[in-house]
Amino acid sequence: MDVLIIDDEKNIRQLLKEIMELNQFNVDIAKNGAEGIELFHKNTYKLIFIDKRMPGISGEEVFAEIRKSDKNIPVYIISAFQSSTELEVLKKGNITGVLMKPFTIEEVMKIVRKHLG
């Protein structure tokens, strides 16, 4: 599998999935943090997108769980709200980057090209 997308918003999941599939990448989708963690532990991914604010297990908690197992996989947090303090905390936790909502297809493709070629 190439990409894991974890987001509680159906529209965001669908948009990212379509972008990946149009570019011939295999995608798994999780609609919450628990599903995302389960998929992460069952499969190997080359790139992960995680929504920061989700009910139940937050994106930050999912990120922390991923980093326990894999320190190197590129992980991008999807967020509509990002203070400079929050960004610094995420970077200290070894986050690869932040994809700010609303995002463009080109912003997503720049990330994909960087990590998946």
Please provide the spans of the model-predicted regions.
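Two-component/phosphorelay signaling modules centered on CheY-like receiver
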Residues: 10-28
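Acidic catalytic/metal-coordinating carboxylates
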Residues: 32-35, 58-62
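Active-site residues of response regulator receiver
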Residues: 51
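Receiver (REC) domain active-site loop signature in two-component systems and cognate sites
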Residues: 54
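A Lys-centered signature of the CheY-like receiver
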Residues: 101
